[in-house]
């Protein structure tokens, strides 16, 4: 298993800190971790490493206002457009992974606030992301 750090630029120019855990062999599936309020993607390292050992490529990112995306904000999300921005960010990342791993099953693992962001994304998607 190898792990790497990266950044993902959103449509409005925000840079999101992200991590990926890749299996040593070709992956059989992909998992996107969408963390909860006050968390960050690094909290899922042990779980992601375990999944990578099961031949699953795992990606996680730090939401706006969280983790290494915004280390000084401690979970603050903009009141006017924050939740919509989180949903747009998930859409961009999910679609990017679908293109990159075309044909592989892609699962979203969402916790707490991340589950609300994920549900909203699934409800508002123009096409079926599932």
Identify the residue ranges that each predicted region occupies.
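Active-site glycine-rich loops that stabilize anionic/oxyanionic intermediates
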Residues: 36-39, 113
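N-terminal cap/lid segment of alpha/beta-hydrolase-fold proteins
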Residues: 1-25
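Conserved alpha/beta-hydrolase
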Residues: 43, 48-73
